């Protein structure tokens, strides 16, 4: 719908209680054009997706390691971009990514050319560079949250330096 620029990542319960229509009206008003709801099963996104579309908001699909058939089913219906989950389990920093991302991206590419961004545990420049070689984007979240927890009100410079290093790793990998 929009070529996602600004995303929000809420859990489903507050969105449901607030109401889909008022929630997506507010998203449109403030310029959020993509939403990732990590606890919403793919099979349950129908009604929410219709309302989101009416407000120019893409519901971003998450694809976790699963069968090729399910990967392709979710990918064929995706909009904005695909959030490819790098590992099973809870989010957070991981020392290594063991999932066969190449095969998952190949399965996605059989049904769509929508951008694929990989996240879930990405925290080192080496991980970011390696993922940037095969995916369209790299998502880093928990590592930044940990910096905020560690440095509090003094986190800004640490985050800036970290994000700059991650960006350089991604840009270098894409040359």
Residue positions per predicted region:
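Catalytic cores of alpha/beta
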Residues: 66-76, 118, 122-138
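Active-site-adjacent beta->alpha loops and helix N-cap segments on the catalytic face
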Residues: 15-22, 37-54, 67-73, 92-106, ...
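Glycine-rich phosphate-binding active-site loops on the catalytic face of alpha/beta enzymes
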Residues: 32-36, 41-44, 84-92, 121, ...
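Active-site beta->alpha loop and helix N-cap motifs at the rims of alpha/beta catalytic domains
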Residues: 8-37, 168-173
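Glycine-enriched alpha-helix->loop->beta-strand junction motifs that scaffold or abut catalytic
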Residues: 27-33, 53-59, 77-84, 134-137
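Surface-exposed amphipathic alpha-helices with a cationic face
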Residues: 28, 49-53, 102-112, 163-174
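Short, small-residue-biased leader/transition segments that mark boundaries at the very start
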Residues: 1-9
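Conserved, mostly hydrophobic/aromatic
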Residues: 27, 74, 108, 131, ...
């Amino acid at each position: 719908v929009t070529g996602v620029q600004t995303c929000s990542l809420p859990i489903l319960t507050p969105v449901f209680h607030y109401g889909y229509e008022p929630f997506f009206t507010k998203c449109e008003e403030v310029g959020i054009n993509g939403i990732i709801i990590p606890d919403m099963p793919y099979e349950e996104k129908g009604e929410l997706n219709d309302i989101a579309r009416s407000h120019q908001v893409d519901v971003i699909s998450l694809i976790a390691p699963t069968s090729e058939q399910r990967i392709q089913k979710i990918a064929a219906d995706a909009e904005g971009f695909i959030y490819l989950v790098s590992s099973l389990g809870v989010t957070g920093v991981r020392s290594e990514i063991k999932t066969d991302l190449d095969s998952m991206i190949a399965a996605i590419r059989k049904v769509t050319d929508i951008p694929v961004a990989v996240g879930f545990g990405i925290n080192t420049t080496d991980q970011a560079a390696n993922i940037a070689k095969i995916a369209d984007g790299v998502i880093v979240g928990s590592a930044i949250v940990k910096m905020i927890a560690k440095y509090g009100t003094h986190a800004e410079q640490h985050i800036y330096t970290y994000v700059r290093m991650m960006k350089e790793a991604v840009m270098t990998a894409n040359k």
